């Protein structure tokens, strides 16, 4: 699925999570999905734990994160 189509899966509604980006209007935030991936969860694990999600939703979260930071210059982040 192309990036533009994937990004249509990400929505923002001020009534849900204060307008944070969410997946297809559900109460599953992009932030949650990215956090789970960063913690080492696999796509299969996430789909098992959140059966309303589809594999393209997870790819959409990654595409959204890429779109957000694509033109940014990032500074080193220190993790303690």
Please report, for each region that a protein language model flagged, where it lies by residue.
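C-terminal structural segments of small proteins and small subunits
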Residues: 55-78
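Short alpha-helical elements of helix-turn-helix
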Residues: 31
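Short alpha-helical segment immediately N-terminal to, or the first helix within
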Residues: 35-36
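A short, basic/aromatic helix-end/turn motif that makes direct DNA contacts
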Residues: 49-53
